[in-house]
């Protein structure tokens, strides 16, 4: 099972890239994690925000792997504990499909992206910088994989 994290936004600052790379390396023992960065749509004075969201959505949909199980990170999504995420990962692994996790832009996902997702996941009600969400998702995927492998990383 391969996992692709598709994130809309600017290139990550060094500290995010380093943290993500660390969890990407750790996770590689159990599954490869690929980061695909989607350029954000143009915003600003005189620009149509909805057009930017729709443009981002088209690029996100084009980046989806064929037949992948798609999980959109979304505030109204289903909240999961680390243990529940591990259970979901075990279920997804049993399906034999690749995974794609989607992080939206500043205004969230385009409607077509949400509709294309098999499920949505909320990492909580806090408003977080999208760059930090990349790191949180990578860490939680590593934690879930470690739980499934009976690795001592998770000590709850």
UniProtKB/Swiss-Prot annotation:
Q: Which reaction does it catalyse?
A: pseudouridine(1915) in 23S rRNA + S-adenosyl-L-methionine = N(3)-methylpseudouridine(1915) in 23S rRNA + S-adenosyl-L-homocysteine + H(+)
What GO molecular-function term can you cite, just one?
Answer: rRNA (pseudouridine-N3-)-methyltransferase activity
* A Gene Ontology term for the protein's cellular component: cytoplasm
Q: What is its main location?
A: cytoplasm
Q: What top-level class of enzyme does the UniProt entry assign?
A: transferase
Q: Does the record carry Chloroplast as a key word?
A: no
Q: What does this protein do?
A: Specifically methylates the pseudouridine at position 1915 (m3Psi1915) in 23S rRNA.
Instruction: Give the record's family classification.
Output: Belongs to the RNA methyltransferase RlmH family.
According to UniProt, the name of this protein is: Ribosomal RNA large subunit methyltransferase H
Write down the species.
Answer: Xanthomonas campestris pv. campestris (strain ATCC 33913 / DSM 3586 / NCPPB 528 / LMG 568 / P 25)
